């Protein structure tokens, strides 16, 4: 068999397990080259996937997947797993509409045992699977693979606390690729881990504990001595305190260390914790040198790497926010910025450099981020929490209980509102208008273009209470914001076009499509701007001289802005029909943003079609 054809023979982990162990390094080399070539053509998460090639091979070589459950945290590192579990050919459709998902997805493969996209869920899920197996009398393993960044979230520690008490038969693998909690790794650590994970060592360890149990002082002395020695060679004391047996750290790119260690741990019972050191971008120098740039990439030439865009490009909403944040910080010393580990994605790189003392990255900890902001607001500061819509869900109780209930002036700059594209249902921001608008004291805004986004952010600074500015991924109409920090009148919309008979009431990202549809329908078009407080006067005015009102929003139609329009009409006894256009009551799959909007009838043509179907039923 030629070296170049080794990967082509792997259509399932069973094929992998039939290989000679000496062939696995070659398989890793081929798999890494395949991922670089494949992702360069489709885009996707690259550096994190290159860092887990050997770990993925070792896991599928040792464990009987899918009978044994592998649970990947976040999912950014699942591409090698997908290739080895029968989806190699499908990788050419990665993150495309109707193609392979960029994250583990239960409906896609039995090897994807738990759907994921957000962080820090793996230990909880694997614990549930482990205890279910115990309850059903089934002999199978549950393994959670979690990154060091995801370990900063409280949910991970809640799960570990529970797992230690439950004495669950599970394995947690810490994929540590940032060296944030690790000493240097070398041969000594690998040898020690193989030794301490062996059956012989652990049988002797338990026998010794049993014997010393008859002499409690000696048992306590032995326990302290063991912890002291471990503390000298490995940072595992914290995990031992949770009731886990800690092993590592070991080199996550050394198959000769990984496989024997995993084989040993497979034989041991109870909660186990393996600390593995990997390198983001491993094997591709460009990604090794800049793992953040190559974390999530578009299409690129593998030989040249990511190239800077040529020519002027439209400002993205994220850039508009980042520029505003720096400008407002110069104008108002009360402003501070907070991000839950999304500095680059949320547009805070420049702010973090220019105002380092006013910039707070709290890690992957959305709950903490929101309440931390509340504490800052209590002391007279103006905290701005930059967060993706989908991640705001994780801090909902804190938004209600710690911010809104106390009417604290925290600004939420909510990026990725609406459909985000290739990342799919775990990352679409489809619910925020519904779940934030219902909270008392909140002011909720959605800009129609980049210039309006800047004005809304400035408006939020003037509001003595919590507010949210919600904007989409990418660029808008190309409107260039002025350098001024102008504001808007709170709760007032704007008529973009005067027509007759039909009024289109559009919110945020869909105003441009509504204006285009209004031209064809000769309809009035209103840019509503504020979801809360709604411009009730404008709604009543439009209801008085139009026979049909059409609400248009890139949010779940249930409980969204359209429902609020109907509430206003009902409270005033106005019986004008309302056609609500928005996202349907289902999770939207991945695909290009424009393609998804067209499919859901939220582009110009879809709006025209829906209105004509309502006014001229066949």
Curated annotation (Swiss-Prot):
Pfam assignment, any one: Transketolase_C
Cofactor binding mode and count: Binds 1 Mg(2+) ion per subunit. Binds 1 thiamine pyrophosphate per subunit.
Record: residues binding Mg(2+): 148, 177
Pathway listed: Metabolic intermediate biosynthesis; 1-deoxy-D-xylulose 5-phosphate biosynthesis; 1-deoxy-D-xylulose 5-phosphate from D-glyceraldehyde 3-phosphate and pyruvate: step 1/1
InterPro entries documented for this protein: Dxylulose-5-P_synthase, THDP-binding, Transketo_C/PFOR_II, Transketolase-like_Pyr-bd, Transketolase_C, Transketolase_CS
Cysteine disulfide partners in this protein: none
Reaction equations catalysed: D-glyceraldehyde 3-phosphate + pyruvate + H(+) = 1-deoxy-D-xylulose 5-phosphate + CO2
Cofactor: Mg(2+); thiamine diphosphate
Keyword flag Metal-binding: yes
PROSITE patterns noted in UniProt: TRANSKETOLASE_1 (PS00801)
Function: Catalyzes the acyloin condensation reaction between C atoms 2 and 3 of pyruvate and glyceraldehyde 3-phosphate to yield 1-deoxy-D-xylulose-5-phosphate (DXP).
Family, similarity comment: Belongs to the transketolase family. DXPS subfamily.
PANTHER family reported for this sequence: 1-D-DEOXYXYLULOSE 5-PHOSPHATE SYNTHASE-RELATED, 1-DEOXY-D-XYLULOSE-5-PHOSPHATE SYNTHASE, CHLOROPLASTIC
Oligomeric and partner information: Homodimer.
UniProt protein name: 1-deoxy-D-xylulose-5-phosphate synthase
Organism: Dechloromonas aromatica (strain RCB)
The organism's taxonomic lineage, starting at the top: Bacteria, Pseudomonadati, Pseudomonadota, Betaproteobacteria, Rhodocyclales
Gene: dxs
């Amino acid at each position: 068999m030629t070296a170049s054809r080794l990967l082509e023979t792997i259509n399932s982990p069973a094929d992998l397990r039939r290989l000679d162990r000496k062939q696995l390094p070659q398989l890793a080399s081929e798999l890494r080259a395949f991922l670089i070539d494949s992702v360069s053509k489709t885009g996707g998460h690259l550096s994190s996937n290159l860092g887990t090639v050997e770990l993925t091979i070792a896991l599928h070589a040792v464990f009987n997947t899918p009978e044994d459950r592998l649970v990947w945290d976040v999912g950014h590192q699942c591409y090698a797993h997908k290739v080895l579990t029968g989806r190699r050919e499908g990788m050419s459709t990665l993150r495309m509409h109707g193609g392979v998902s960029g994250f583990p997805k239960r409906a896609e493969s039995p090897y994807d045992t738990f759907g994921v996209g957000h962080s820090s869920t793996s230990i909880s899920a694997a614990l549930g699977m482990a205890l279910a197996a115990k309850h059903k009398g089934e002999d199978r393993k549950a393994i959670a693979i979690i990154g060091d960044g995801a370990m900063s979230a409280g949910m991970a520690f809640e799960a570990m606390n529970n797992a230690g008490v439950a004495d669950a038969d599970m394995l947690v693998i810490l994929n540590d690729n940032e060296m944030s909690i690790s000493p240097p790794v070398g041969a000594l650590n690998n040898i020690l881990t193989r030794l301490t994970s062996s059956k012989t060592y652990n049988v002797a360890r338990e026998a010794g504990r049993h014997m010393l149990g008859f002499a409690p002082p000696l048992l306590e002395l032995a326990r302290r001595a063991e912890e002291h020695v471990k503390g000298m060679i490995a940072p595992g004391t914290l995990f031992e305190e949770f009731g886990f047996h800690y092993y590592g750290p070991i080199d996550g790119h050394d198959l000769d260390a990984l496989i024997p260690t995993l084989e040993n741990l497979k034989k041991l019972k109870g909660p186990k914790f393996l600390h593995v050191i990997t390198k983001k971008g491993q094997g591709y120098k460009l990604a090794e040198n800049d793992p953040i740039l190559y974390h999530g990439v578009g299409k690129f030439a593998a030989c040249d790497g990511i190239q800077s865009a040529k020519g002027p490009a439209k400002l993205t909403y994220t850039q508009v926010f980042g520029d505003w944040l720096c400008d407002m910080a110069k104008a108002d010393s009360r402003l501070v910025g907070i991000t839950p580990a999304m500095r680059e994605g949320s547009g805070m790189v420049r702010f973090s450099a220019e105002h380092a003392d006013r910039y707070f990255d709290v890690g992957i900890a959305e709950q903490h981020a929101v309440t931390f902001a509340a504490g800052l607001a209590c002391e007279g500061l103006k905290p701005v929490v930059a967060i993706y819509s989908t991640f705001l869900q994780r801090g909902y109780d804190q938004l209600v209980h710690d911010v809104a209930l106390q009417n604290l002036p925290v600004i939420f700059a909510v990026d990725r509102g609406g459909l985000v594209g290739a990342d799919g249902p775990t990352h679409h921001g489809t619910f925020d208008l519904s779940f934030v608008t219902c909270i008392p004291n909140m002011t909720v805004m959605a800009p129609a273009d980049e210039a309006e986004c800047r004005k809304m952010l400035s408006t939020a600074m003037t509001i003595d209470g919590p507010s949210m500015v919600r904007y989409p991924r990418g660029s808008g109409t190309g409107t260039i914001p002025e350098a001024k920090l102008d504001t808007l009148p709170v709760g007032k919309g704007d008529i973009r076009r005067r027509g007759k008979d039909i009024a289109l009431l559009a919110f945020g990202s869909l105003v441009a499509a509504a204006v285009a549809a209004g031209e064809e329908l000769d309809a009035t078009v209103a840019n509503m701007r504020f979801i809360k407080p709604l411009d009730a006067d404008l709604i009543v005015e439009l209801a008085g001289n139009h026979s049909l009102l059409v609400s248009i929003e890139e949010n779940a139609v249930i409980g969204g802005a359209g429902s609020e329009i109907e509430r206003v009409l009902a409270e005033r006894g106005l019986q004008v029909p309302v056609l609500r256009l928005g996202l349907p009551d289902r999770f939207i799959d991945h695909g290009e943003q424009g393609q998804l909007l067209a499919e859901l009838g939220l582009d110009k043509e879809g709006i025209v079609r829906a209105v004509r179907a309502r006014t001229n039923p066949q």
